[in-house]
């Protein structure tokens, strides 16, 4: 995706998919949405994959999913890379792509199985329904989780430990330097 120059994982996925009979169009690194869209329209893929190694790539993937959704696409989108996770995909990504399905693929060795599940006309609906149910469950757990109320920075600063002569002496009185 745009902003990410890392390509090792993407390259491994491409090789694994090609070795298993899939036709792959590898767009390279630093790929913006317009290039992705142009290739979707030209190549007519069954599945789209996005990969990212750095944290800003997650926001770029979310933006791409939102645009794909707005543009009316419903292609399955595979998400992978070091910064991605099942929870992040369910909580932050999937809600931006309501017309399609977003699948977190944590390892290149799993991509062929996921693609076969998604492309199997007899079982893909069940696979997608189960995946979306799992993502909805993850989202529900997230929304119901205990919220941490952080203290405002000014309040935290006002409660900082204040050193003075008495508390310094109390802290050091049992510490014998001569031993």
Residue ranges of predicted features:
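C-terminal interaction appendages of subunits in large macromolecular complexes
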Residues: 72-76, 102, 139
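Active-site loops and adjacent core secondary-structure elements that bind or stabilize anionic groups
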Residues: 107-179
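Cofactor-cradling patches in redox/metallo enzymes
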Residues: 10-20, 24-96
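Generic secondary-structure signature for well-ordered alpha-helical cores
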Residues: 66, 70, 94-99, 116-124, ...
């Amino acid at each position: 995706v745009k902003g990410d120059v890392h390509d090792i994982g993407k390259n491994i996925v491409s090789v694994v998919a090609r070795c298993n009979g899939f036709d792959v169009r590898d767009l390279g690194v630093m790929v913006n949405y317009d290039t992705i869209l142009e290739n979707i329209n030209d190549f007519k893929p069954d599945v789209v994959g996005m990969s990212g190694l750095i944290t800003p790539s997650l926001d770029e993937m979310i933006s791409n999913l939102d645009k794909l959704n707005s543009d009316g696409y419903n292609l399955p989108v595979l998400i992978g890379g070091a910064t991605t996770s099942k929870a992040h995909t369910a909580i932050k990504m999937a809600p931006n792509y309501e017309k399609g399905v977003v699948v977190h693929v944590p390892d290149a060795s799993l991509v062929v199985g996921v693609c076969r599940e998604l492309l199997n006309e007899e079982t893909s609906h069940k696979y997608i329904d189960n995946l979306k149910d799992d993502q909805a469950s993850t989202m529900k757990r997230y929304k119901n989780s205990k919220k941490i109320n952080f203290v405002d920075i000014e309040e935290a600063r006002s409660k900082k430990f204040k050193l003075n002569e008495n508390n310094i002496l109390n802290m050091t009185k049992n510490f014998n330097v001569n031993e």
